[in-house]
C-alpha cells in the first residue's frame, strides 16, 4: 500500500509547464465564450482507436468560414502518438510524439507543416521533461534564415512556483524573448505573476469560492504607457449539466455565457459581448457553439 501511495502522490508534485502557469485563471476568462462566432466541433473515435476531430466556424462580422480536421492514433505499447492535421488554408501537418520510452518523464515531438499552395515548409522538434519539482522544455524551430531555440523551466516546491522562458534567434544572434514568472497554488487558490521582456507586467488570481463557484481576477500593465488592463470573471455551475459564465473589464466590456449539456456528448454554448459604454450604439456580439462527441 505504501508504494501505491507514493505513485499516486507523485503527479501532484510535478509543476505545470511555463505555458500553463496561470491557466486556471485564464480558463475562467476564455472558456464558455465565443463572441462573434458560430462554431461546430465534432469528435469521434473508431473501433481501431483512431480519433477524429473536426472543427468549423463562421465569423458573424466578416462571414469568413474556417475549418480544421485532425486524426490521431495512439500506439500505447510504444508510447507513440501519430497526428495528421489539415485546415481550410490548405496547410498539412504531421506530428509524431514519443513519451516515457527513452526515460520516464521525457517527451519528444517531431512536428512538420507543408502548404501545397505556397510550397512553404516548416519543421520543429519539441522536447519536455517533467519530474517531481521540475518541468523543462526545449523546442527548436527550423527556418531557412536559421533555427530559433525556445527554452523554458519551471521549478516547484511546497506550492511555490518559479519559471523562466526564453527564445534565442540564431539568425539575429540575440534573445527575442525573456520572461519570468512566480506563483503559488493550492487546491482551491492560485496566484500568478509574470514579467515579459522587462516591459509587460501581469498577474492573476484564481479562487474556488465553493464547489459550484470559480472566480478569477486579471491585471496587466505595459511600461511606458498609462494603460492598465483589469478584469474580473466568474463561473457558476447551476447543476451538473448547466453553467453560466460572466466577465467584465475596465473597458466596460461585459461578457456572459451559458453552457448546457443537452445529452451525453452534446454541449451547447450561447454567449454575448456587450459594450457598456455604448449600449444603444450597437456593435455588440453574440456567439453560438455546438460540441458533439461520440
Curated annotation (Swiss-Prot):
Pfam families: Porin_3. InterPro entries: Porin_dom_sf, Porin_Euk, Porin_Euk/Tom40. The modification Phosphothreonine is found at residue 118. GO terms for biological process: binding of sperm to zona pellucida; mitochondrial outer membrane permeabilization; mitochondrial transmembrane transport; monoatomic anion transport; phospholipid translocation. GO terms for cellular component: acrosomal vesicle; membrane; membrane raft; mitochondrial membrane; mitochondrial nucleoid; mitochondrial outer membrane; mitochondrion; nucleus. The record marks 84 as: Involved in ceramide and phosphatidylcholine binding. The modification N6-succinyllysine is found at residue 31. It is found in: Mitochondrion outer membrane; Membrane. The modification N6-acetyllysine is found at residues 31, 120, 277. Ubiquitinated by PRKN during mitophagy, leading to its degradation and enhancement of mitophagy. Deubiquitinated by USP30. The chain crosses the membrane at residues 37-46, 50-58, 65-75, 80-87, 91-100, 106-115, 122-131, 134-141, 148-156, 161-169, 174-186, 189-196, 200-209, 213-222, 229-238, 242-249, 253-262, 265-274, 284-293. PANTHER family: VOLTAGE-DEPENDENT ANION-SELECTIVE CHANNEL, VOLTAGE-DEPENDENT ANION-SELECTIVE CHANNEL PROTEIN 2. Monomer, homodimer and higher order oligomers; formation of higher order structures is necessary for scramblase activity. Interacts with ARMC12 in a TBC1D21-dependent manner. Interacts with KLC3. Interacts with SPATA33. Interacts with PPP3CC in a SPATA33-dependent manner. This is Non-selective voltage-gated ion channel VDAC2. It comes from Homo sapiens (Human).
